[in-house]
């Protein structure tokens, strides 16, 4: 009886430790989609040098993180995120998930990016489990940032016993940047 109790306690502790999440600052991982590395804030698209020469509406839109994504690799069974929205945007014609949520994609063996799930925001400060109960194997991820809001901070949560590291695959390739400028139809927010 005593031996069974000890085994139960050990198993309970192992599963409890495994279930805990550890959060890692996303600024430690590659950020895709910025015009330049010299932008003022980490999750803004334009450098501060453009502030005084840009129209105010354009400058304000540049503070949204649309088109930007974080790349990382992990063997975690759970991926979570903590983030603070810059403006806490709400729109009548779009859900908060579309405006200030996050979208997680996983790189498949055939080279395609597959949608995993969205992190649905509850307010300005958020903590969401994006996916859980996965098989523990190394995967490449891309976490897309909010379309119509910016970020103050972002952390990625993984199992306490899992690894999280720099991506091994340089994909999408970033050698020759392409700039798109247009309306929300181009962005995909409205049609």
What are these regions (language model features)?
Residues 1-21:
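Bacterial Sec-dependent N-terminal signal peptides
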Residues 7, 162-164, 187, 191:
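A generic structural micro-environment signature
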Residues 19-177:
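N-terminal secretory targeting modules
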Residues 175-191:
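Catalytic nucleophile-elbow at a beta strand-turn-alpha helix junction centered on a G-D-S/GDSL motif
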